[in-house]
Each structure stands twice: as C-alpha cells, then as structure tokens.
A protein has these predicted regions:
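Alpha-helical transmembrane segments of integral membrane proteins
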Residues: 2-3, 112-145, 161, 186-327
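N-terminal signal-anchor/signal peptide hydrophobic helix marking the start
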Residues: 6-16
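Hydrophobic alpha-helical membrane-insertion segments
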Residues: 16-21, 154-165, 255-260
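Hydrophobic alpha-helical transmembrane segments of membrane transport/permease proteins
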Residues: 16-76, 176-193
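Membrane-water interface segments at the C-terminal ends of transmembrane alpha-helices
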Residues: 25-33, 151-180, 200-202
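Hydrophobic aliphatic residues
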Residues: 26, 30, 40, 44, ...
C-alpha cells in the first residue's frame, strides 16, 4: 500500500508539472505582459515607461520561456515560467498582479473558510438526499412513484442552474422576503445568507445524482445475492439498505469523491451570483482582471485537490469492498 501511495504521489507531481506548463502556455497565448500592465495600470494613456515599470515590479520583464541573452542554465532559470513555477511548487503563491498586490496565500486561507461554509453542508446533504431519493425510487420501482420520480429527475437535470438562481432570488427574497437576495456576513449571521445558495445548488444537482444512483441500485437488484436474500424471506427494505446500498458504495464513492475539490474551491456560479466572497468569486475576479498570479495559484491548488481526492477514493474502495487490492 505504501508503494502504491508513493507511486501515485510521483504520478501526481508529473501531472502538476504538466498542468502548470499548460496553464502558463494558455494564459500567455491569449495575453501578454504588456496587456496585463495596461489593464492593471488603467487610464486612457499608458506610457511604455509605466508598462516597463509595472513589468519590472512583478517580474514580467524577463522572457517567458527561453532567455537567449543569458548563459548556461540561466537560459531556462531566468525566465518567467521557471521563476513562477519554482515558487508555486514551494507553495509560495506570492502577491497578485493587480494594483492592490494582495497576499494570495492569505486570501486563499480566508476565502477557503467561506467556501467551506457553503460547499461542505451542500456536499453532505447532496450525498444523503441523492442516495435516499434513489433508494426510494428503487423501493417503489415499476410504480407511479418511480415513474414520476424519474420524470422529476430528468426535469431537474434539464434546467440550468441559472434558472434556479433567478427563480429562487425572485421568489424567496423579493416576494417572500425570507432570506437576503445576496451578500455575506460572518458568524451565525452567515446562515441566512447561505441557506438559499445551498438549497438551490442541492436542487440543481439532485436530479443528476439521484438518477445515476437509481441506475446503479437497479443494476445491483438484479444480481444473484439479492435474489438469494429475497428467497430467504428478507424484507425489501433490509435487502436495499443492508445489501444493495453496501455493494453500490464504490460508484457512490467515485461520484461523491470527484466533487470533493469543489468543497474547497467553491462554486464559481453560486458565489458570484450571491455575492459570497469565497474562492469561486476570487477566481472570477482574477480572470476578469487578467491576474495570472491568482489564476495559476488556483489552478495549481485545484490540481492538487483532484489528485489527493482520487488517491483518497482509491483507499476508500478498499474500505467499501475488501476484495479490492491496491497494487
């Protein structure tokens, strides 16, 4: 198991190197340091001197990939790609490229807690609600409850998340005045600002997850061990909850585990629409401001979380099914 973990971590490092280079290439294929300087300096008339000063202050005055004027290894090391990559792998995110030059590491720590307040309850409720709803439909399979439940799932997954947001804000905030339409507050006051985003996000994902889990549970109900359990006279509820659910844990773990990075990174759409200052909103602001320092930091953290979550999923498989071995 230790050898497996070491091997996966080494693979993960290679993936991070590839992600870092690909992010760098894509960003500077669309933008140039001069474009970034003009956007951040602002104003109608930006002189070349101001641009060069901005680039020198933020380390963009060097070649991006290859320094032809340098000698030896400095042809590679005295480039923007190398200097930014080394600091990134040392978990030194530096400061943003904007005029405020905020400490990216501090912003991530502060905003991650806010994103967790939104995403962690949503993650837990999503797994419970989707599993329970899917089991309910399987329990009443081939009945009207199952039919209309599937119709409801298809309807929910066919509707855009933006529709839920617009209708929810109009109905619950403007009409009923139950919760604030947007914003955020610290402490227990955060609950009233997070209730609607959590509820609407749950609805937006429930149809997709419940329909997937229902298909997995139905596949399990046709297997020999289920027929044997029924032949022994076990009630259908025990067959479903004790046997079917246990043996369907692996696909559930896969589906739920793939969502784990979003728990930490936040939801881009919901945080932006509801004015929640989490990591999702942080990324949107960085993209709009062409802030490469923030963009590459968030992409790097996202890649680390995805690698870590899939390693955790593999270990969770061995817990859910003792027959699984990590080689």
């Amino acid at each position: 198991m230790l050898n497996y973990l070491i091997r996966r971590v080494l693979y993960g490092v290679l993936i991070l190197i590839g992600v870092n280079f690909f992010t760098f290439f894509l960003f500077f294929n669309v933008n140039t340091p001069d474009d970034m300087a003009r956007l951040n300096i602002g104003g109608k008339r930006v002189t070349q001197e101001q641009i060069e000063k901005w680039k020198a202050e933020r380390g963009y005055d060097r070649p991006l990939y290859w320094n032809a004027k340098a000698e030896g290894t400095e042809k590679v090391t005295r480039t923007v790609l190398w200097e930014r990559s080394v600091s990134l792998f040392a978990l030194d995110f530096g400061r943003s490229d904007s005029a405020r030059a905020v400490d990216i590491g501090h912003e991530i720590k502060t905003r991650m807690w806010i994103s967790l307040q939104l995403a962690l309850p949503l993650f837990i409720l999503q797994v419970i609600a989707s599993t329970a709803f899917a089991l309910l439909l399987v329990f009443f399979r081939h009945s009207k409850i199952d039919f209309w439940g599937v119709v409801l799932c298809v309807l929910m997954l066919s509707i855009s998340a933006l529709f839920y947001i617009i209708v929810g804000q109009f109905f619950f905030s403007r009409t009923l005045h139950l919760v604030p339409i947007s914003g955020y507050a610290g402490g227990f006051d955060a609950i009233k600002f997070l209730l609607m985003p959590i509820g609407l996000s749950l609805l937006a994902r429930l149809g997709t997850e419940a329909r997937l889990y229902r298909a997995m549970f139905l596949e399990e109900t046709g297997k020999d061990y289920v027929r044997t359990a029924r032949a022994k006279g076990l009630p259908e509820s025990i067959v479903l909850f004790r046997h079917v659910l246990k043996n369907a844990l692996i696909p559930i773990i896969t589906s739920a585990g793939s969502y784990l990075p979003y728990v930490f990174l936040g939801s881009l759409v919901f945080e932006s629409f509801f004015g929640i200052p989490g990591l999702g909103a942080f990324v949107i602001e960085a993209i709009a401001g062409q802030d490469f320092a923030i963009v590459r930091s968030m992409v790097f953290i996202g890649a680390v979380l995805y690698i870590a979550s899939y390693i955790a999923i593999d270990f969770a498989y061995t817990w859910a099914d003792p027959r699984v071995r990590l080689a």
